[in-house]
């Protein structure tokens, strides 16, 4: 018999077997009836949308890829294609609807760019939508498999790194010369019987212990498991908190603050033509006006600056009195931290940075000095700047969006005893003003494109003399103490993570870039 006929016959027999089993198991108990005790040696197979995740739609996650890789125009194309996808999905073919979403969001994109977004951006949004009952069962099993219609390249980093999945069976997208074509590899979109076929091919005669799904089309693969449970649609279910995940999400990237639902995606597209000119106006006000007027200008333009604590008065320094300026030790949220510090003080405070883009240097209203990464050179430069007046530094070396403080570099503590900790925190409703993967020159524009961004600057008490290096404390003791004080003020958690940890997690490098000849290596800051 011809091999193709044998393969066709095998597929037909498998489909018949699946149909018979599905008819015999047309109803499954709900997931809350599944015990999670004694499952350490069991294998679980779970669907993703509507099962592991509360939301049943994958629209927001494809929208994130469209925006983060292709920009606002690609998001617009994707949004225009979504009604077609919805009609196909609900009235003609589930797989055809998903195919349209894949094509509209990924066609022509580099696979490496899609993988980068999947690793650095999507986990934050996926983790905020985790179903508590499904996670209770899924996390209790020793071997975890996810079977999903979503492209594997899109979901695998989150499932394996943050949920501890051992195996991810997803739709495979086709590519040409490293770029996604928008088409799907065989056997196609994994829905209905195709899920069951892939599961049967992967596990063979071995039956997984638990199958978890949320819709009728999941019944074929659930019927191949020893136990099957349905996850009912309950939109008001409380999501799993981050502390219950095997690995907390400390670092994440991407420009969007909120999950881009269809309505939110439309608002983003409509707002950007308004928000960008508004951002330019706000930046111009901060750059061109005297610093003592910037606070009022920001307020008039919708940027709120909240000042807490008592700012120290300016220190009169000169070559004769040898008095050092105050060194402001700031927690690092965006590259705008020193600018909002200056706004709160009403005077320009120079800042040392690990590297900012040339555009950011041009539009900055304050003096910025780059660190060289050579300890002796940087120490001499900071001492010189302190002799000229007050100075700001962010010893974390890079930004962190979550309520954590990274390790403080101890160099600053060796250079002066005039230390004032400053707790910085900001609130944005639409765009993040930081990036690890994109061009940092756009960071201030994205921050000021938010409709009403907020910056809160809290001045803490000046460090007592007995807690400085001048009184016998080591620089590491001083740095760790200031980190704890700032973290306590913000209700943040101290960590020992560094800039290198962040960039390895988000960008796949250690955060350093090679500068042009005759220039020292600079660190990608912020």
From Swiss-Prot:
A motif (HXXXXD motif) lies at residues 332-337. InterPro entries: HAD-like_sf, HAD_RAM2/GPAT1-8, HAD_sf, Plipid/glycerol_acylTrfase. GO terms for biological process: arbuscular mycorrhizal association; cutin biosynthetic process; glycerolipid metabolic process; response to symbiotic fungus. It comes from the Eukaryota. The keyword Cell wall biogenesis/degradation does not apply. Keywords: Acyltransferase, Membrane, Transferase, Transmembrane, Transmembrane helix. Disruption phenotype: No visible phenotype under normal growth conditions. Unable to be colonized by arbuscular mycorrhizal fungi, with a defect in hyphopodia formation on the surface of the root. Defects in colonization by an oomycete pathogen, with the absence of appressoria formation. Its main location: membrane. Induction: Accumulates in roots, in a RAM1-dependent manner, during colonization by arbuscular mycorrhizal fungi (e.g. Glomus versiforme). Triggered by RAM1. Belongs to the GPAT/DAPAT family. Involved in the production of cutin monomers. Esterifies acyl-group from acyl-ACP to the sn-2 position of glycerol-3-phosphate, a step in cutin biosynthesis. Required for colonization of the root by mycorrhizal fungi, and appropriate hyphopodia and arbuscule formation. Cutin monomers act as plant signals that promote colonization by arbuscular mycorrhizal fungi. This signaling function has been recruited by pathogenic oomycetes to facilitate appressoria formation and their own invasion. This is Glycerol-3-phosphate acyltransferase RAM2. The lineage of its organism: Eukaryota, Viridiplantae, Streptophyta, Embryophyta, Tracheophyta.
């Amino acid at each position: 018999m011809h091999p193709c006929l044998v393969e066709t016959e095998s597929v037909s027999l498998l489909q018949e077997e699946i149909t018979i089993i599905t008819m015999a198991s047309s109803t499954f108990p709900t997931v809350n009836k599944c015990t999670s005790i004694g499952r350490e040696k069991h294998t679980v197979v779970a669907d993703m949308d509507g099962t592991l995740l509360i939301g049943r739609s994958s629209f927001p996650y494809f929208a994130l890829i469209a925006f983060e890789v292709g920009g606002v125009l690609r998001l617009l194309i994707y949004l225009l294609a979504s009604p077609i996808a919805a009609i196909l999905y609900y009235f003609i073919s589930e797989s055809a609807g998903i195919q349209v979403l894949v094509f509209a969001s990924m066609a022509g994109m580099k696979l490496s760019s899609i993988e980068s977004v999947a690793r650095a951006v999507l986990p934050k949004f996926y983790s905020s939508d985790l179903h508590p009952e499904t996670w209770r069962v899924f996390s209790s099993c020793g071997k975890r498999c996810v079977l999903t219609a979503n492209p594997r390249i899109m979901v695998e980093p989150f499932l394996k790194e943050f949920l501890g999945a051992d195996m991810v069976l997803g739709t495979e997208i086709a590519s040409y010369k490293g770029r996604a074509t928008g088409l799907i590899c065989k056997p196609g979109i994994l829905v209905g019987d195709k899920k069951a076929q892939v599961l049967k091919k992967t596990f063979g005669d071995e039956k997984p212990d638990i199958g978890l799904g949320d819709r009728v089309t999941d019944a074929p693969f659930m019927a191949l498991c020893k136990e099957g449970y349905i996850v009912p649609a309950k939109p008001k279910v409380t999501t799993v908190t981050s502390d219950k995940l095997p690995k907390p999400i400390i670092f994440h990237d991407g420009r969007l603050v909120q999950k881009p639902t269809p309505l939110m995606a439309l608002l983003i597209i409509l707002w950007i033509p308004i928000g960008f000119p508004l951002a330019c106006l706000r930046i111009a006000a901060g750059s061109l006006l005297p610093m003592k007027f910037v606070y009022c200008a920001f307020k008039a333009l919708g940027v709120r600056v909240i000042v807490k604590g008592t700012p120290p008065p300016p220190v009169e320094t000169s070559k004769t009195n040898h008095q050092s300026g105050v060194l402001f030790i700031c927690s690092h949220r965006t590259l705008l931290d020193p600018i909002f510090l200056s706004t709160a003080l009403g005077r320009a405070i120079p800042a040392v940075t690990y590297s900012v883009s040339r555009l950011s240097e041009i539009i900055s209203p304050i003096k910025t000095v780059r660190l060289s990464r050579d300890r002796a050179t940087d120490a001499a430069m900071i001492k010189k700047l302190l002799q000229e007046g007050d100075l700001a530094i962010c010893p974390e070396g890079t930004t962190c969006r979550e309520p954590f403080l990274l390790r403080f570099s101890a160099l600053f503590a060796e250079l002066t005893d005039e230390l004032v900790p400053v707790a910085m925190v900001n609130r944005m409703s639409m765009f993040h003003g930081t990036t690890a993967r994109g061009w940092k020159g756009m960071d201030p524009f994205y921050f000021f494109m938010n409709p009403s961004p907020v910056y809160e600057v809290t001045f803490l008490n000046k460090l007592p003399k007995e807690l400085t290096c001048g009184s016998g404390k080591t620089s590491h003791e001083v740095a760790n103490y200031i980190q704890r004080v700032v973290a306590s003020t913000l209700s943040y958690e101290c960590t020992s993570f560094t800039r290198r940890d962040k960039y390895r997690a988000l960008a796949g490098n250690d955060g350093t870039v090679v500068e042009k000849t005759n220039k020292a290596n600079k660190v990608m800051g912020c």
